[in-house]
Amino acid sequence: MAKAPIRARKRVRKTVSDGVAHIHASFNNTIVTITDRQGNALGWATAGGSGFRGSRKSTPFAAQVAAERCADAVKEYGIKNLEVMVKGPGPGRESTIRALNAAGFRITNITDVTPIPHNGCRPPKKRRV
């Protein structure tokens, strides 16, 4: 039985005017994901994936570079306006927002969505250096 030839599907680039930038700023790394309004990921970048390793991942500059790389990845979608959702206490919170603003996006709203426990799990013990 002959198989039908497999055709590669053309990837259709959709144009999105408004997007949502999800910034996950932990103490060790920063993850930047830009989605459309429905939550479908359009592009993402991390400080670790941008060439920073070890303790340099957890710097504001690494978060800035990750935001610039993520912005370059989603330029082809035609996003003009961004709503920013920041999660976590990490050092890359502010520098990521500044980098997205400098990349040419108009930031319409900044929301802090850091999960706060209503006395849930016990936190890690304090460091003794």
From Swiss-Prot:
Disulfide bond sites: none
Keyword Protein biosynthesis applies: no
PROSITE patterns from the UniProt entry: RIBOSOMAL_S11 (PS00054)
Gene3D superfamilies the UniProt entry points to: Ribosomal protein S11
A Pfam entry, by short name: Ribosomal_S11
Matching PANTHER family: 40S RIBOSOMAL PROTEIN S14/30S RIBOSOMAL PROTEIN S11 (PTHR11759)
Protein name: Small ribosomal subunit protein uS11
Subunit structure: Part of the 30S ribosomal subunit. Interacts with proteins S7 and S18. Binds to IF-3.
Family matches, as InterPro entries: Ribosomal_uS11 (IPR001971), Ribosomal_uS11_bac-type (IPR019981), Ribosomal_uS11_CS (IPR018102), Ribosomal_uS11_sf (IPR036967)
Record's GO cellular component terms: ribonucleoprotein complex; ribosome
Name of the gene: rpsK
Family of this protein: Belongs to the universal ribosomal protein uS11 family.
Assigned keywords, A-Z: Ribonucleoprotein, Ribosomal protein, RNA-binding, rRNA-binding
GO molecular function, one term: rRNA binding
